[in-house]
Amino acid sequence: MAAAPLYCVCRQPYDVNRFMIECDICKDWFHGSCVQVVEHHAADIDVYHCPNCEPIHGPYMMKKHNNWHRHDYTEPNDGTRPVQAGTAVFVKELQARSFASGDILVQMQGNQVTKRFLEKEGFNYPIVVHDLDGLGLKLPPPSFSVSDVEHYVGANKVIDVIDVAKQADSKMKLGEFVKYYYQPERPKVLNVISLEFSDTRMSNLVVVPDIAQKMSWVENYWPDDSFFPKPFVQKYCLMGMKNSYTDFHIDFGGTSVWYHVLWGEKIFYLIKPTKANLALYEAWSSSPNQSEVFFGEKVDKCYKCVVKQGTTILLPTGWIHAVLTSQDSMAFGGNFLHNLNIDMQLRCYEMERRLKTPDLFKFPYFEAICWYVAKNLLETLKELRENKCEAQGFLVNGVKALISSLKMWLRRELTQPNSEVPDNIRPGHLIKALSKEIRHLEDDSNKAVKTQGSAECSLSRSTLEKGDQAQQAARRLQDHHHHRRRHHHHHHHHHHHHHHHHSRKLPSNLDVLELHTLEVLKRLEVGQLKEDSAFSSKVNGKFKKVCPVPAAAVEASHDNALRLVMCNGKIIRERMPITNVAATVNAVEMYHKHRIKLERIPMCPEEKVKKEKCEDEFGVQCTIKKPVSQGESVQTELRTESPHLASSDSDSKAGDSAEKCSLESESSDGEDGGSQRDSGTFVEHLNSHRHSHHKQALKRERPTSPNTDCAIQGMLSMAGLLCPQASGGAADILQQRWWASQGNGSSTSSSSDMWDSSEPCSAPRSPDAEDGSLGEEYSYRESSLSPPLHPSKRHAPNPTPVSNQATKGKRPKKGQATAKQRLGKILKMSRHKGLFLMKPMVFLIPQQGGTPLDPQFLLQSSSICVFPPPLIVSG
């Protein structure tokens, strides 16, 4: 094998990393360092004579300056060629131009520039910070000089130097640049803008701003065991001579920039990276006469920003900018990729590829870091979804753009072998996983939008119909503190969503009973119940909303306004002030005396919600017991339901817990007659006593006619309507009970398109609910806004049976109903979890009673029992 040719006076082979110059006489090549010719100076030599030829042919000859406005100053100055960027003439013209003021700059304090602020407000405009305090940036003192840079970095450090007049890049040692910088006369303007010193001793003198450190992809996502070398782009030292100029450009990879002028002055010419401006920039960059066209004139606005000594500027992603050094300056800066503008960063990178930008001016291993970022963002999205946190918009948009770029890079690898996919990453699997997470986010976002949209409609409905419940709760709370008052005042309740007041008057007990009676008569086809026009006008579709319970209702739940014991339709005990302990003692006494067994009802959260809600609204719960064969009995409610529900065998089993919690009733054809007669009796009574009870809550005094008033109170108790309702909304609230029970039946029922459904719940009752308070899981599930249908015309749901430990082994056999039934067929066990089957000789101890109950009442309590949610009595 032939030996490599030797060159230069040193007789060394060719070294690609060393600058060499050819002798025009002997045609031999010489190292610039061996013949004392620097690279940037060689371009000005017209004819070079090596040291061997110089004694014979004389010294080398330099080029003549024919013009001062062209990169090639040897061109004739005939005035026909335009001015090129960077030349002396260009700089003078640039300083004379007028630009838009830098009013787009965001003036901030150092402690205000935080990651949270940028994530919330966005990083779309340049930020100027005049004080270093709070920015986290540490730099050498302003007395730090170019020679100090040489001391910390090293004189032999090879750096890239730009000849400003020619806009040409060349390499030289740092020591040579420093020597040239301190010359009294500098024939050329040299600019150093790419001295990265992270691997030098000077790195210890500089600490990058906190915002750049916390947001940087390299610092946060680049693994230590990466096959690719870690990019160092965070610490640059820029040393520029006066009149140095860098033409318009976008920093590599669309990186953002932090820039601090240690001493001197810099002038930035800024252009916003709009789509139009980016398209113009790409066309301008690829044009052959790029240096002859000032890009600032091609866009709508170009802003001028003067950065003086001690000032820091942060440039966002993609901003097109040029820099003029108006005086000798030293500055420190750095570049960083981040999550805020992923889309723009990728667009800038693809633009660099289309423009065939040399690797020297591109972000090192840009594609590799994008793969690392994609892997980490996948984990971030998973955590957000698992924690049920909403992903920020910039992150979602960035991941979408990243997925598109990753797919494109994979396709490009089929034809281009230079892959930057890390070895420990499965690209196809990663892209699929990211796409899946994005789909989850979009699905959740669509659900959130629907929920938000329905919230407005539901809250509007709540304002008109359900807002009255908050009024009722407030009234009960006031009654508890002022129970000796004979009259109640009407109060305004401030709705916590809509922030406006309701001033509607509350109806009396007779009004409520009349509305309910008319409702029952309509279902029995005796009379028609007119739909509320205000409600019907708002029925536009189906909405779902889970509304929080008003605060007044929560407080009122701790002290239930009323506890009644009824027998044969008469109120035996009313509002007896006895504690829970006293009630328990009474229960024990009743157990020993009458062999009555007390049980506590385990309730799921949803059952507790509806149970306590009904209790807060109406004050009591009532059941109608009907003896059947063998002394067993079942319960029914005042309301009726479609007949075909009674024939379902599945309804006799343990039903859905959500349905059991609702207050719903069923009726049979054979019982319509009796119900009709009883209802008619109460309608007559309502018409005669309505005005005497108007605008009054439940009376605390002995009525004038005990038998009549007891009958009214009994019907109210059986209907669950003892608490006064708001005028105009009572009928709607009554109807809503049926909606809640119908909708909570089963998610697979045939009527699921019209009525809401909820998941069955079997969680035990919380301790807070046992003492009359509301648990944390208390929520009100608003029904669909579908128009209310007549109960006999609605389709019955097919509830899914749910096992309930409290009801196992206690279901009575179906038997013949008694002759004393009043308003409906027997209520099946599957329809009410909180109402249990009891024998005729059973009563309930009130939760807040007064004096112990007379055992004589046991002989009369054969049809009606009123009991609080926590306790039931069974024989």
UniProtKB/Swiss-Prot annotation:
Binds 1 Fe(2+) ion per subunit. Residues 442-506, 629-710, 742-820 are annotated as: Disordered. Residues 448-462 have a biased composition (Polar residues). Residues 742-762 have a biased composition (Low complexity). Pfam families: JHD, JmjC, PHD. Substrate binds at residues 246, 266. It is found in: Nucleus. Residues 197-353 form the JmjC domain. Keywords: Chromatin regulator, Dioxygenase, Iron, Metal-binding, Neurogenesis, Nucleus, Oxidoreductase, Transcription, Transcription regulation, Zinc, Zinc-finger. Residues 478-505, 688-697 have a biased composition (Basic residues). The PHD-type zinc finger mediates the binding to H3K4me3. Binding to H3K4me3 prevents its access to H3K9me2. This is Lysine-specific demethylase 7A.
